[in-house]
Amino acid sequence: MIKTAKLPLELDTEFIQAVTDLFENKITFNQVLGMKLTEVKPDHVRARLPMRTDLIGHYAHQRIHGGVISACLDAMGGIAMMGAMGARHFDESCEQRMKRFMKLGTIDLRIDYLRPGVDTHFDLSAEVLRLGSRVGSARMEFRGSDGKLLATGTGAYIVS
């Protein structure tokens, strides 16, 4: 979690709506995946992914594809960075803060698969570990509906 007194505890509604719209509607690949944000805070985000047959990677066991897990965790790390960047630049307009997304990109991503993903839906979370002036880092989790940890990720993101 980011340790700084400069960040507000909450984000403004306009920014949260803009980030949600970006994540769920404007990033086409996220539409394909089907993730829906459930919480956007300055230091973390949460989302839900309903299981669908087109996300299956192992047909015999009905497991979610590892690439889906990886893509979802990467997207969560990126949107967590957006929340932190939005909080850091709280004095800017929503439009100015959203333009910062254009500079955001994944530098490094590591995924650890811990258990097979067989469920009706999955819960995802990401927390910002550090937000520097050029690079940020995040830790992400992919859990089953029962709360069991199925995969973890860490990511580094260019933020400027």
Which residue ranges define each predicted feature?
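Terminal targeting signals and extreme-terminal segments of soluble enzymes
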Residues: 1-160
